[in-house]
Amino acid sequence: MDKFSKSAKLDHVCYDIRGPVHKKALQLEEEGHKILKLNIGNPAPFGFEAPDEILVDVIRNLPTSQGYCDSKGLYSARKAIVHYYQTKGLRDITVNDVYIGNGVSELITMSMQALLNDGDEILIPAPDYPLWTAAATLAGGTVRHYLCDESSDWFPDIADIKAKITEKTLKEKLRQHY
């Protein structure tokens, strides 16, 4: 069988859905230990299920849901999101500003690919959700982690953020504000 080598883009990507932490968890599970799998973002095994009214709506709409919707997401859902955020004081948002995806992974990846050019630096909090670092790296960015200290209720260390900003860190328009 022919073997395919992995892309060099993966050299600096560590995302523990399939990495060493996952392998260790599988080993411990095989040994009889109960493992809480919090690495995949799947809330259903922990009792977080869709409310009945949403399930009823899904079932009712199945006959007309066989195909793609607008690439930004369902108009009615985007409109509801705009309304919600307008009640929270975000007045300038419109339906055209809202994108809905198939979960946070798709949207994080899409955002990083849209915003980063090869060699751009991006500030990401540490500790972080590994997908941010992986998506930024695969999009050609260089991740610069800033500290969030547990002893300070996980608030970001502003001095550390400022120390990490370089000419490659922020787009020119954003850099003017720092």
Language model: regions and residue ranges:
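N-terminal small-domain helix-loop-helix segment of the aminotransferase-like
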Residues: 2-4, 11-103, 110
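Short glycine/proline- and acidic residue-enriched helix-loop micro-motifs
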Residues: 6-8, 176-177
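Conserved core of the PLP fold type I
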Residues: 65-178
